[in-house]
Amino acid sequence: AAIACAAAAPNALTLPDELAEAEAFALGYQAYVVGAVYARSQILMEKDTNPDAPLNAPLNTFNVYPGLATPGAAIDFTPNNDTVYGLAWLDLSQGPVLMTIPEVTDRYYTIQATDLALNTFAYVGSRVRSKAGTYAYLPPGWKGELPAGVTPLQSTTNGVFLQARTLVKPE
């Protein structure tokens, strides 16, 4: 009975119904604005790592679309006549993921890294004059030591989306 009385008694947190409804709406709206992009990332990751997807690859593995994207291609990239696309979803929850890039001097390429909020946090490629070498995508707060010569790329989330674009020359 004491619990029922305490729950029914007004306190500093009790709001009139119209204010409680407005606050609930505002909190729901804020949750949507902040959370929708994370939900979208999860949907994209599940689609792109699905073995039946047209441009699929398991976590921590790159897959390159075979050929140029066309308007009928079932991928999430813009069709054009001079770019080959690739993608990878990284899981950094167990630690850094390393990527080695060869020397590329004869064409434009870029690998864009985004966190789960789809904010770009790093580029590797000719766009930013990257050199051949090994790059480490680091999870938030990681304090370990990398091998000599490895370039660290700090993510703000344990999930990372890599989008590769490579210019192809007409043949």
Region roles according to the model:
Residues 1-2:
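Sec-dependent signal peptide recognition
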Residues 10-171:
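A compositional/structural signature for long, glycine/proline-rich flexible linkers
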